[in-house]
Amino acid sequence: MTPTSPSPDLLPTLPDVRGKLLRGAELAPYTWFRVGGPADALFLPADEEDLEAFLKALDPAIPVTPLGVGSNLIVRDGGIPGIVIRLMGKYWGEIEALDGITLTARAGALDLAVAKAAAANGITGLEFLSGIPGSLGGATRTNAGCYGSELRDRLVALHGFRRDGSRVAYRGPGKPGALPEAHFSYRHTDLPDDLIVTRLILEGTGAGDPEAISADIAALQARRAQTQPIKEKTSGSTFANPDPPGTPDQRSAWKLIDAAGCRGLKVGGAQVSPLHCNFLINTGDATAADLEALGELVRARVLENSGVELRWEVRRMGRVQRV
């Protein structure tokens, strides 16, 4: 998570691991846009102990970038320098109910899987996660939310590692305890940049009937399928709404984009979705540069039309490819 790139002689000296360490791994298959260049190396740790040992042994000059399921991300065409760490597989997707209202889940668990696990255990209040594409770790980084709820609303505690391999933990906003408090705002968190989230404890709003909760999730999924381009190569919402939820006369990013005449707008193989214009889609042959250029064009047109400067919600990272 530093801007410096390692010299070529650093990567051959990477620590031994029990998971997988792939040099020069293409990252496009790991992102929902299916674009982007390679990582100098991609590390898929077997478990927390494997991740901890790797970070402690890794040369501090080598940058580290955590990657979730790539649902809210544009990896630039020049790839990502240093080590990309992805928490994936059965271990990192584990979810366990702790009691009738709380559960714990590892950072690689899909948001939808967490919502369904909560439903199966009769825990209400986590249904909104079914509308968030991606994994729990990524949702934490952006304080993801929808349908009137955000991750911070349900967070009891989170655990993870700093870049040097030290273990850290934070309590959720307003939660009691001796741990330092994690601070969140609309689509933002003040957690350290080098933090790799590994596990969370979430609290529902109460107990309910599993079948009724599951029916609510199914209804939210059906609504999402009707209003968002979920079958396309896309991500979550491209831009954050200018106003936080609950703001009187809240302005929506998609309405501003539509009013600026951007619905269906194209740059190369990238397009503003005709179905929901706060989504960019890869029509088949887009590059990361196409997507980013289209996003900037949308921002410019919205600024000219309404005077509002939209803020990217999709993360963009990596090196710009030199032509």
Swiss-Prot record:
Subcellular location: Cytoplasm
Polar residues: bias regions: 227-240
Domain FAD-binding PCMH-type: 35-207
An individual GO BP term: regulation of cell shape
Region (Disordered): 227-251
Keywords: Cell cycle, Cell division, Cell shape, Cell wall biogenesis/degradation, Cytoplasm, FAD, Flavoprotein, NADP, Oxidoreductase, Peptidoglycan synthesis
Tree of life domain: Bacteria
Enzyme Commission number(s) from the entry: 1.3.1.98
Principal EC category: oxidoreductase
Pathway this chain belongs to: Cell wall biogenesis; peptidoglycan biosynthesis
Catalytic activity: UDP-N-acetyl-alpha-D-muramate + NADP(+) = UDP-N-acetyl-3-O-(1-carboxyvinyl)-alpha-D-glucosamine + NADPH + H(+)
A Gene Ontology cellular-component term: cytosol
Active site as annotated: R187, S237, E313
GO molecular function, one term: UDP-N-acetylmuramate dehydrogenase activity
The protein's role, per its UniProt record: Cell wall formation.
Record's protein name: UDP-N-acetylenolpyruvoylglucosamine reductase
